[in-house]
């Protein structure tokens, strides 16, 4: 009952002027809650529905190909699973933002949601990195490192990725995740809650290096060399150049790289610059407030990646695109049939005949 009362009546707060209530506590960190409690839940609702539907569709298409699985499909399947698990952690975060950065569900549940959130975010980063290395080996070094593309070895690599991410994120369970603010709001998974942790600046700089620095360099290097190789192959083979296949592949590579950089760079650069400043001097309340607001924006941008991946699959994979269009055509056909059953008999027959004529004419064109 107490939890329900807290859900229904979150604490109210005024917006004080930028100041400190004592030498250590900044009271202006959440002054933006007035518009954040509207915009952030709206944004995350879109990410949740688009991400869940898109990735569920991707998993539905990948799953029947398990018998013909290869290294790329296996990495893609793990990436899809990480995106689905990530989106499933969003509803409680949506409630948290809708209540104006108030978490009434306790420390334990906050830690569980936080752990799921970070595990699947960085699992996704690592599987995108694996995909870039896999493509690099397939095109640039197909014979020398072919063993790394064997399905039996790739399975071990996937298990290793999950274990690595788990080891990187499990320390979160030993850190404080919630904090009661002076205005009565209880925050969850916010940066200021981690400030009391000893050497937090060094920990986060190391996390940025391992979780973002190594993957982004690997992805950009692999895809840059891959693009050069494809250009050279296109120049050497006039048929390939005329068909435009190389240009399409290069376009997809650039798109994947751009999405990764745009989604993940702002958050990690923002975190890195503040931690470096924190090592040099003690930022004041105004700087901490600006950093906190920027974190909320850059985290939104980072989380957008989970619902962009299915669109990349659509344009990058011919088989995926074909199957999606088949499913959509099937749904349209079912909708026509349902509509016809609800109409008078004569009109229903006219629609059915018209639909058959359309399908037959389409088949003749093909």
Swiss-Prot record:
Residues that span the membrane, as ranges: 38-63, 84-101, 112-133, 156-174, 200-222, 249-272, 293-317
PROSITE patterns: G_PROTEIN_RECEP_F1_1 (PS00237), G_PROTEIN_RECEP_F1_2 (PS50262)
Residues carrying covalently attached carbohydrate according to the record: 21
Disulphide connectivity of cysteines: 110-188
Membrane topology according to the record: Multi-pass membrane protein
One cellular component (GO) term of this entry: plasma membrane
Classification via Pfam families: 7tm_1
Keywords in alphabetical order: Adaptive immunity, Cell membrane, Disulfide bond, G-protein coupled receptor, Glycoprotein, Immunity, Membrane, Receptor, Transducer, Transmembrane, Transmembrane helix
Subcellular location: Cell membrane
A GO biological process held by the record: positive regulation of ERK1 and ERK2 cascade
InterPro entries according to UniProt: GP183-like (IPR047160), GPCR_Rhodpsn (IPR000276), GPCR_Rhodpsn_7TM (IPR017452)
A GO molecular-function descriptor: G protein-coupled receptor activity
Extracellular topological domain: 1-37, 102-111, 175-199, 273-292
Gene3D superfamilies: Rhodopsin 7-helix transmembrane proteins
Source superkingdom: Eukaryota
Segment forming the signal sequence: none
Segments on the Cytoplasmic face: 64-83, 134-155, 223-248, 318-366
Sequence similarity: Belongs to the G-protein coupled receptor 1 family.
Protein purpose: G-protein coupled receptor expressed in lymphocytes that acts as a chemotactic receptor for B-cells, T-cells, splenic dendritic cells, monocytes/macrophages and astrocytes. Receptor for oxysterol 7-alpha,25-dihydroxycholesterol (7-alpha,25-OHC) and other related oxysterols. Mediates cell positioning and movement of a number of cells by binding the 7-alpha,25-OHC ligand that forms a chemotactic gradient. Binding of 7-alpha,25-OHC mediates the correct localization of B-cells during humoral immune responses.
UniProt name for this protein: G-protein coupled receptor 183
Organism of this sequence: Salmo salar (Atlantic salmon)
Taxonomic lineage: Eukaryota, Metazoa, Chordata, Craniata, Vertebrata
Gene: gpr183
């Amino acid at each position: 009952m107490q939890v329900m009362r807290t859900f229904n009546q979150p604490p109210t707060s005024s917006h004080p002027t930028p100041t400190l209530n004592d030498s250590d506590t900044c009271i202006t960190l959440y002054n933006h809650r007035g518009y954040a409690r509207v915009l952030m839940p709206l944004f995350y609702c879109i990410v949740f529905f688009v991400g869940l539907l898109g990735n569920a569709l991707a998993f539905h298409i990948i799953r029947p190909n398990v018998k013909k699985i290869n290294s790329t499909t296996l990495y893609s399947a793990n990436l899809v699973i990480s995106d689905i698990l990530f989106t499933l952690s969003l509803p409680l975060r949506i409630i948290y933002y809708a209540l104006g950065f108030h978490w009434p569900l306790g420390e334990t549940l906050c830690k569980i949601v936080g752990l799921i959130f970070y595990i699947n975010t960085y699992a996704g980063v690592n599987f995108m990195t694996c995909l870039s290395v896999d493509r690099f080996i397939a095109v640039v070094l197909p014979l020398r490192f072919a063993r790394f593309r064997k399905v039996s070895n790739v399975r071990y690599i996937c298990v290793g990725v999950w274990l690595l991410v788990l080891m990187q994120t499990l320390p979160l369970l030993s850190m404080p995740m919630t904090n009661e603010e002076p205005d009565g709001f209880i925050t969850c998974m916010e940066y200021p809650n981690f400030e009391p942790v000893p050497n937090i600046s060094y920990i986060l700089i190391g996390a940025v290096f391992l979780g973002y620095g190594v993957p982004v360099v690997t992805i950009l290097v692999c895809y840059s060399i891959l693009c050069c190789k494809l250009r050279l192959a296109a120049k050497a083979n006039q048929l390939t150049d005329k068909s435009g296949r190389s240009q399409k592949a290069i376009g997809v590579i650039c798109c994947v790289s751009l999405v990764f950089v745009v989604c993940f760079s702002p958050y990690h650069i923002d975190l890195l610059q503040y931690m470096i400043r924190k090592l040099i001097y003690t930022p004041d309340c105004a700087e901490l407030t600006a950093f906190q607001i920027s974190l909320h924006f850059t985290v939104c941008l980072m989380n957008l990646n989970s619902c962009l991946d299915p669109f990349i699959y659509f344009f990058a994979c011919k088989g995926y695109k074909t199957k999606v269009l088949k499913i959509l055509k099937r749904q349209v056909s079912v909708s026509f049939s349902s509509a016809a059953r609800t109409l008078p008999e004569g009109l229903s027959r006219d629609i059915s005949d018209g639909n058959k004529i359309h399908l037959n004419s389409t088949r003749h064109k093909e």
